[in-house]
Protein backbone atom coordinates (compact mmCIF):
# COMPACT_ATOMS: atom_id res chain seq x y z
CA UNK A 1 0.00 0.00 0.00
CA UNK A 2 1.35 3.47 -0.85
CA UNK A 3 2.46 5.91 1.81
CA UNK A 4 -0.06 8.48 0.51
CA UNK A 5 -3.34 6.71 -0.34
CA UNK A 6 -6.09 8.43 -2.31
CA UNK A 7 -3.83 10.65 -4.35
CA UNK A 8 -5.59 12.28 -7.32
CA UNK A 9 -3.47 11.57 -10.40
CA UNK A 10 -3.80 12.70 -14.01
CA UNK A 11 -2.12 10.34 -16.47
CA UNK A 12 -1.36 11.85 -19.89
CA UNK A 13 -0.28 9.08 -22.27
CA UNK A 14 -0.94 8.61 -25.98
CA UNK A 15 -0.03 4.89 -26.04
CA UNK A 16 -3.19 2.94 -25.06
CA UNK A 17 -1.45 -0.07 -23.50
CA UNK A 18 0.83 2.09 -21.37
CA UNK A 19 -2.06 4.36 -20.35
CA UNK A 20 -4.18 1.36 -19.29
CA UNK A 21 -1.29 -0.21 -17.37
CA UNK A 22 -0.61 3.04 -15.49
CA UNK A 23 -4.32 3.44 -14.75
CA UNK A 24 -4.61 -0.14 -13.45
CA UNK A 25 -1.42 0.00 -11.36
CA UNK A 26 -2.32 3.30 -9.72
CA UNK A 27 -5.95 2.34 -9.02
CA UNK A 28 -4.85 -1.05 -7.65
CA UNK A 29 -2.70 0.87 -5.19
CA UNK A 30 -5.55 3.02 -3.93
CA UNK A 31 -5.23 6.16 -6.02
CA UNK A 32 -7.88 8.05 -7.98
CA UNK A 33 -6.88 8.29 -11.65
CA UNK A 34 -8.11 10.27 -14.64
CA UNK A 35 -6.53 9.67 -18.04
CA UNK A 36 -5.97 11.83 -21.09
CA UNK A 37 -4.67 10.70 -24.47
CA UNK A 38 -3.00 14.02 -25.27
CA UNK A 39 -2.12 17.45 -23.94
CA UNK A 40 -5.36 19.08 -25.02
CA UNK A 41 -7.46 16.52 -23.14
CA UNK A 42 -5.20 17.02 -20.13
CA UNK A 43 -5.76 20.79 -20.16
CA UNK A 44 -9.53 20.26 -20.28
CA UNK A 45 -9.36 17.91 -17.28
CA UNK A 46 -7.14 20.35 -15.39
CA UNK A 47 -9.85 22.97 -15.85
CA UNK A 48 -12.46 20.65 -14.32
CA UNK A 49 -10.66 18.68 -11.59
CA UNK A 50 -8.00 18.98 -8.93
CA UNK A 51 -4.87 16.80 -9.04
CA UNK A 52 -2.01 16.01 -6.70
CA UNK A 53 0.28 14.57 -9.38
CA UNK A 54 0.41 14.75 -13.18
CA UNK A 55 2.18 11.89 -14.97
CA UNK A 56 2.83 12.93 -18.55
CA UNK A 57 4.52 11.16 -21.42
CA UNK A 58 7.30 13.41 -22.64
CA UNK A 59 7.08 12.45 -26.32
CA UNK A 60 3.52 12.71 -27.63
CA UNK A 61 2.22 13.83 -31.00
CA UNK A 62 0.73 17.31 -31.14
CA UNK A 63 1.28 18.88 -27.74
CA UNK A 64 4.24 17.06 -26.20
CA UNK A 65 5.03 16.86 -22.50
CA UNK A 66 7.24 19.94 -22.56
CA UNK A 67 4.48 22.05 -24.15
CA UNK A 68 1.96 20.71 -21.65
CA UNK A 69 4.33 21.57 -18.80
CA UNK A 70 4.68 25.17 -20.04
CA UNK A 71 0.89 25.50 -20.18
CA UNK A 72 0.60 24.09 -16.67
CA UNK A 73 3.24 26.57 -15.46
CA UNK A 74 1.19 29.45 -16.88
CA UNK A 75 -2.32 28.27 -16.01
CA UNK A 76 -1.77 26.21 -12.85
CA UNK A 77 1.64 27.22 -11.47
CA UNK A 78 0.97 25.43 -8.18
CA UNK A 79 0.86 22.14 -10.15
CA UNK A 80 4.16 22.60 -12.02
CA UNK A 81 6.17 21.00 -9.18
CA UNK A 82 3.72 18.07 -9.27
CA UNK A 83 4.52 17.05 -12.87
CA UNK A 84 6.41 13.82 -13.53
CA UNK A 85 7.56 13.04 -17.06
CA UNK A 86 7.48 9.45 -18.29
CA UNK A 87 9.67 8.58 -21.28
CA UNK A 88 11.43 5.74 -23.04
CA UNK A 89 14.26 8.07 -24.07
CA UNK A 90 16.77 9.75 -21.80
CA UNK A 91 16.29 13.53 -21.74
CA UNK A 92 19.22 15.56 -23.01
CA UNK A 93 21.53 17.16 -20.38
CA UNK A 94 20.03 20.64 -20.85
CA UNK A 95 16.55 19.32 -20.10
CA UNK A 96 16.39 20.61 -16.50
CA UNK A 97 17.64 24.04 -17.50
CA UNK A 98 14.64 24.44 -19.79
CA UNK A 99 12.47 24.66 -16.69
CA UNK A 100 14.43 27.29 -14.84
CA UNK A 101 16.48 24.73 -12.96
CA UNK A 102 13.45 23.31 -11.17
CA UNK A 103 13.94 19.56 -10.83
CA UNK A 104 11.21 17.90 -12.89
CA UNK A 105 11.21 14.18 -12.09
CA UNK A 106 11.67 11.90 -15.09
CA UNK A 107 10.58 8.26 -14.89
CA UNK A 108 12.46 6.38 -17.61
CA UNK A 109 10.90 3.25 -19.13
CA UNK A 110 11.11 0.47 -18.28
CA UNK A 111 10.32 1.02 -14.61
CA UNK A 112 8.84 -1.16 -11.90
CA UNK A 113 5.48 -0.51 -10.25
CA UNK A 114 7.41 0.09 -7.02
CA UNK A 115 9.52 2.80 -8.68
CA UNK A 116 6.39 4.44 -10.12
CA UNK A 117 4.73 4.52 -6.70
CA UNK A 118 7.90 5.79 -5.02
CA UNK A 119 8.21 8.70 -7.47
CA UNK A 120 4.58 9.64 -6.84
CA UNK A 121 5.04 9.47 -3.07
CA UNK A 122 8.19 11.60 -3.36
CA UNK A 123 6.37 14.27 -5.36
CA UNK A 124 3.46 14.39 -2.92
CA UNK A 125 5.83 14.53 0.07
CA UNK A 126 7.64 17.59 -1.32
CA UNK A 127 6.97 20.88 0.37
CA UNK A 128 5.93 22.95 -2.66
Give the location of each predicted region.
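Acidic, metal-coordinating helix/loop segments flanking the phosphotransfer/catalytic sites
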Residues: 35-53
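Two-component/phosphorelay signaling modules centered on CheY-like receiver
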Residues: 16-34, 104
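Non-catalytic signal-transmission and effector/linker regions of two-component phosphorelay proteins
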Residues: 1-8, 101, 112-128
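Acidic catalytic/metal-coordinating carboxylates
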Residues: 38-41, 64-70
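Receiver (REC) domain active-site loop signature in two-component systems and cognate sites
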Residues: 60
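Hydrophobic/aromatic residues positioned on beta-strands within the core alpha/beta folds
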Residues: 84-87
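Active-site residues of response regulator receiver
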Residues: 57
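Conserved acidic carboxylate
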Residues: 13
